[in-house]
Amino acid sequence: MKKHYLEFLRILLLAQIFFFSGTNLVSSEDNTYFLTSESLLTYCQSNLPAEDGICQGYLAGVTDSVYSGHLGDFISICVPKGVTTTELKTLFISYAIEYPEFFERAADGLFTDALASKFSC
């Protein structure tokens, strides 16, 4: 339990660093989202711990929003208990590589598509 809690805190801290750093963000003048699918893919493929944390934290947040936010009203996704953020990262990388035409989309959209393709109810 303690190991999972510490891992969660690490990912949360790294996600906060990402949000406050402003790197690889899309200008709010051009779009209403902050992270493109291509930018998220770059983070997810990185060997740097901070960027890996940004990736996994973002994916965990989107996955949580499916259940606690409005996304659950529009899509039917049932992520099995026990799926790790590392597994979510692997799913996103393979899906994003398969659909490069969506790189300029908001990252949550492409990842939600990946979740729906793998974990449809």
Please annotate each region the language model reported:
Residues 93-121:
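Short, compact, well-ordered microdomains
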Residues 23-29:
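Sec/Tat signal peptide C-region and signal peptidase I cleavage site
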Residues 2-12:
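Bacterial N-terminal signal peptides that target proteins for export
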Residues 10-22:
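Bacterial N-terminal signal peptides
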Residues 32-94:
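Short N-proximal segments of mature Sec-exported proteins
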